[in-house]
A protein has these predicted regions:
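GST-like domain detector, emphasizing the conserved glutathione-binding G-site
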Residues: 1-130, 135
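Short, solvent-exposed turn/loop segments enriched in Gly/Ser/Thr/Pro and often Arg
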Residues: 7, 151, 197
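A generic structural-conservation signal
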Residues: 29, 147, 172, 193-194
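Conserved beta-strand edge residues that scaffold enzyme active sites
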Residues: 34-35, 177, 198
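Phosphate-coordinating loops and pocket residues in cytosolic domains that bind phosphorylated ligands
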Residues: 43, 81, 186, 195-196
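GST-like fold's C-terminal all-alpha helical module
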Residues: 85, 97-188
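Terminal-tail/helix-coil boundary detector
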Residues: 195-203
Length: 203
């Protein structure tokens, strides 16, 4: 059985929990206190971070790597495109999300650190601008890739859920994106994947 070491408030762990519930398979989630991590976390992941996936003698870390492995191991429902060209494009989009959005999410996750106010405001503004630029896609598309739910939707969902929590308010121009977010939030797997700590993040 797969075991996922997951932070109860960690957006990256949230991605992996979401995929596991979408697949509807047997797995175990072990909650990790992000402020008091057990020693074996550093043994399994030299960067000392969660999520970590363990299956027999395989240990994986980094949410996108974990999720692609789960998708290949349990291909139904398929979340990565079957075509190599489309799959490569999705990987580029995932990389873009990390560089353009989630580097700033990481700053916001550290917002309890004093003296970081300017960086926090800059990150909030950058996320707001990038999401607003993305909004017109959803005037036509149900999901990132059209009608089909995919790994791109999984990757961005934890950020969209945390907008209130991070103090990011989007303008009316982002209305199509917010409707798209509600479609994701209504998925049974998304609801199941939420921890009690995450449920209270959104008004």
């Amino acid at each position: 059985m797969m075991v996922l070491y997951s932070g109860t408030t960690c957006p990256y762990s949230h991605r992996c929990r979401f995929v596991l519930f979408e697949k509807g398979m047997d797995f175990e989630i072990r909650d990790v206190d992000l402020y008091n991590k057990p020693e074996d976390i550093a043994v399994m992941n030299p960067y000392g971070q969660v999520p970590i996936l363990v299956e027999r003698d395989l240990i994986l870390y980094e949410s996108n790597i974990i999720n692609e492995y789960i998708d290949e191991r349990f291909p139904h429902p398929q979340l990565m495109p079957g075509d190599p060209v489309d799959r490569a494009r999705v990987r580029l989009f995932l990389l873009n999300f990390e560089k353009e959005l989630f580097t700033h999410v990481s700053v916001l996750e550290q917002r309890s650190v004093k003296g970081n106010e300017k960086a926090i405001e800059k990150s909030k503004a950058h996320i707001r601008d990038r999401l607003t630029q993305l909004a017109p896609v959803f005037l036509k598309n149900k999901y990132m890739l059209g009608d089909n739910f995919s790994m791109l939707d999984v990757a961005i969902a934890p950020l969209l859920w945390r907008l209130d929590h991070y103090g990011i308010e989007l303008s009316k121009n982002a209305a199509p994106l917010l409707k798209y977010a509600e479609r994701i939030f209504s998925r049974p797997a998304f609801i199941e994947a939420l921890t009690p700590s995450e449920k209270v993040m959104r008004k």
